[in-house]
Structure formats: C-alpha cells, structure tokens
Amino acid sequence: MARIALVTGGIGGIGTSICTRLAKDGCTVVANCHPSEAAAAEEWKQARAAEGFDIAVFTADVSSFDDSARMVREITEQVGPIDILVNCAGITRDKTFKKMEQAHWEAVINVNLNSVFNVTRQVWDGMLERGFGRIINISSVNGQRGQFGQANYSAAKAGMHGFTMALAQEGASKGVTVNTISPGYVETAMTLAMNDDVRNSIISGIPMRRMAQPDEIAAAIAFLAGDESGYMTGANLPVNGGLFMH
C-alpha cells in the first residue's frame, strides 16, 4: 500500500518539487496551503494533474494548533493516516533588529517553528502506534550560521534543529525517524526576481557557483522519506553547495 505523505507549504516552489518527487516515488501525496491560497491551490492542483499527478490539497493555517488538528483529522478520514510529514511551510519578515517589531518576530516564529509542533503533534501518536514514520523538517543554512536582518527567521530555523534532535530520541526505538534538511539558496521565483547584482553576489559566495534547483532539495527529502534512510535520525542534511560547512 502506498504511503501517505503530507507536505505543509506544499504549493510553493520547493513544496511543488517535493510533492511531485514523492508522488513519482509512489507515495499518495497531500499538499497543504494557507486558506488564503485556496484559489491558487485549485490552479496548482489542475497543473499537477496535467503533469500526471493526483495530489490532494487541504487548506489550514498551520500556525494554529486547532486548525492543524482539523486538517490532519480530515486527511485521515478522507485519505488515510499520515506516514510521512514534510514540514515545509515558511515565511520571511526580514528587518534589521533595530526595525523589527513584535509582529515581525511572532509571525515568523508562529509559521516557521510553531507550525512544526502543531502539525507533528497531530501525526506523532499514530506513527508510534503503527511502528513507522518519517518526519522531515525544512530548515535553512541561516539556521546554522545566522543572517543579517533575519534574527526572527534564523532563530526559528535554528529551533528546528533542537526540536529534531529531541524528538528523534523519542521515536528512534519505535520506527519513527526525525531529520532536518538545511537548504542554501534555491532557484525559485523569489530568487530569480532578485536584482542581478544581488543575485550574482550571492552566487559568487557559493563554492559551487550556483543556486540549488528545487528538485535537488526534493531528492534529499525523498531519501529521508524512504526505507533506505531507516537508520538515520536526529540528523541535519546540509544541501547548500558548500555555502556553510560544519
């Protein structure tokens, strides 16, 4: 029977590649998006169908514990219990700390970090009971090294690492692995829209002299979602072209 995978933030640039890769690998894939993206999600679903992928979309504000619980309950009832969770939802509210307001801080922490707890908590018990689970948290190179103007984002992404390592210890003997991936710069609509000088400056600082393709991030996730990674837990995979080495 196909394993069921939920990808939060699943209709974004990286999320799309994750969804299609997991579907190619034989998973039944469910994408999540914010309720405000419902219209875009319908177009996204049709575009994936045209590519040969039948991917369901469930809306929920994953920064809300109650809405996350509702979503997972509906997925379980309509599709089945979730075997693979990819926590990919994320936003930025970049400001220098001098200009950062509480709203900027809370928005990023709520979506980028609290959502990881909110959704994982809904699937955790079932994974333990069934003796199998894969939880993959999408962090960032900036959660390892920090980034000017991203105190909120860097803190949230760094928090994922502690969460991952702690939870991995609780699931290890039960067949549930918990890992993190830390991408560097990825070629998405957002990075392609950058000023050429800014983009070229970023690329010059990457040892591989290019940004990652979304499919390269998805390939790493596919490995962590599969059986061959069953002995890996509590780990962080840096997929950053050598931008940060630790």
Swiss-Prot record:
Subcellular location as annotated: Cytoplasm
A Pfam family of this chain: adh_short
Keywords of this entry: Cytoplasm, NADP, Oxidoreductase, PHB biosynthesis
Source organism, top-level taxon: Bacteria
One of the protein's GO biological processes: lipid metabolic process
Molecular function GO labels: acetoacetyl-CoA reductase activity
Binding-site residues for substrate, renumbered to this chain: D94, Q147, F148, G149, Q150, G184, Y185
EC top class, as a word: oxidoreductase
Pathway the protein takes part in: Biopolymer metabolism; poly-(R)-3-hydroxybutanoate biosynthesis
Gene Ontology CC entries for this record: cytoplasm
Catalytic residues as annotated in Swiss-Prot or TrEMBL: Y153
Reactions accelerated catalytically: a (3R)-3-hydroxyacyl-CoA + NADP(+) = a 3-oxoacyl-CoA + NADPH + H(+)
EC code(s) of this entry: 1.1.1.36
Gene3D superfamilies linked to this entry: NAD(P)-binding Rossmann-like Domain (3.40.50.720)
SMART domains per UniProt: PKS_KR (SM00822)
Matches recorded under SUPFAM superfamilies: NAD(P)-binding Rossmann-fold domains
PANTHER family: 3-OXOACYL-(ACYL-CARRIER-PROTEIN) REDUCTASE, 3-OXOACYL-[ACYL-CARRIER-PROTEIN] REDUCTASE FABG
NCBIfam families (alphabetical): AcAcCoA_reduct, PRK12824.1, PRK12826.1-2
Name this protein carries in UniProt: Acetoacetyl-CoA reductase
Organism, as annotated: Allochromatium vinosum (strain ATCC 17899 / DSM 180 / NBRC 103801 / NCIMB 10441 / D)
Name of the gene: phaB
